[in-house]
Amino acid sequence: MTINFVPVKKGAIMLLTGAKEHLFFICNDPVFYPALTKECFLAVNLTTIYRDIAYDDTCILGIGDHPFVKHDSYILYKKAEVLGVDTVTSQVMAGDIRVSEPCRNDVFDRILNGFNVSPHVKPKIRKFYNKYCR
């Protein structure tokens, strides 16, 4: 099966992190990123809220915000990462990464605004965000 995939702003992909798949939102259209010398994009993931575990409440998504969301979840800004287009595309083609429904505009705006608010955004991620995602 051939899947044509190009990462685009507001897109979403399912990546295996640890033992579970997590939804990652694509924060920008691919750009040449000199630090990695290739086309890249910023991705940030969504993870479940467990009431007995501390979490970043900067951006909470609930049922209705995205088809994947089945219960309250939060954007895990501290684990946002810059991903290479070539790597992700080849993993999608191999079936190791699944493509999910894109993000609605209003939800996407909330996610992006969180990069300016969350105290957990790493400096290199904030720099990438400010240069390529705004």
For each predicted feature, which ranges?
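General secondary-structure edge motif
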Residues: N4, D57, Q91-V92
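Loop/turn positions that initiate beta-strands
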Residues: K10-G11
